[in-house]
Each structure stands twice: as structure tokens, then as C-alpha cells.
Amino acid sequence: LRDKITNSKDLKNYSEELKSIEKEITFFHAKIVDEMIKSHSKFEIDIVGFHGQTIFHNAEEKITVQLGDGKLLSQLTKKKVVYDFRHNDLKNGGQGAPLTPIFHQNLVRNIDLEWWPVVALNIGGISNATSISRLYPMDVEDDVDLKRYGKDYKLFAEDIGPGNCLIDE
């Protein structure tokens, strides 16, 4: 799959070749999801999160392209599938990595830390950092912060530069 993505020439026009690769990626993910569901049969899986395979991302210009068909994945797995995270995050002012800050928040939620804010670093293809600040009643101007970020924390996350992409082949 990696070679097919790398060698695909027509990203701009979303060629038939890319559509075929997208279908193949979706079937591959469906197989993995089915295997995970079978191996964790004691848990009821209600929903699957699927971000696909990113083949182009430019947060500054709000452009991102992922291969993977969430609707097809839902049909294949017979599960509800949440997808298109990166695109929706860009549309709403983010940088296209909406799940990482939530994961970081959950990591520190139950730790009794003396110093705030906490900054978590995620070194993926592109590195991003999440600043997690504790909210105190006097810090909250209205309910928007509480509804958006959770009861006790405010998150700020952004891409900060290259990460593993420098060593990826």
C-alpha cells in the first residue's frame, strides 16, 4: 500500500488509482477492526474511530487529504464509524490532530500535579505539543470553556515541527 500511495501521481485530481488504493486501505482496516473485535469479545464495541491514511497535510492552508472511506468501513464492520477528524478539526480552527490533545488531557487528569500548565509532546510524523491548563472558577468567562474543554482543563495544541518524518522511509 505504501508503494502505491508514494507512486500515485494524481493527488490533485483524485485519480481512479487513488480511489482504488482508498478502497484497499478501507478493506485492510475493516479486517483489522474485525480481528480486534473478535480478540476483545468480552467488550461491546459500539463505535469505531477512523482517520484513514494521511497522504497530504498543510495546516496553514487548511488542506488535508486522507485515504479511507468511513462509510464503507461502517458497512464492512457493521459498526458506527466516526471519521474525517483532521478535515473537521481544520475547519474549526485546529491543526488537524484533534485526538492527541484529548489523549494528553486524559493522561494527566488523575495525576496530582503541583505545577501547571503541563505540556505533552507527541512525536509522530509531525511533532505536536499540547498545553493543558487547569481552570479555576475565576478563569472561566462563560460556560463555553467548560463545555468545550471539559470541566477542569483547557487545552491548546499545535504542530511544532518535523518529527519522525525525518527518519521515515
How should each PLM-predicted stretch be described?
Residues D46-Q105:
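Glycine-rich phosphate-binding loop and adjoining helix at the ATP-binding site
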Residues S8, K12-G70:
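Short beta-strand-loop/turn "lid" adjacent to the catalytic site in phosphate-handling enzymes
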Residues H40, T77, V108-D112:
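A broad structural signal for alpha-helix termini and local helix breaks/kinks
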Residues L1-K4, V82-N110, V119-E169:
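Glycine-rich phosphate-binding loop plus the immediately following alpha-helix
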Residues K4-N7, K42-I45, Q75-T77, D142:
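Short hydrophobic/aromatic-rich motifs at helix boundaries and adjacent loops
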Residues A30, D34, K71-Q75, I102-R109, ...:
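A broadly conserved amphipathic alpha-helix scaffold signal in soluble, globular proteins
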Residues K42-E44, L113-W116:
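Short helix-loop-beta connector
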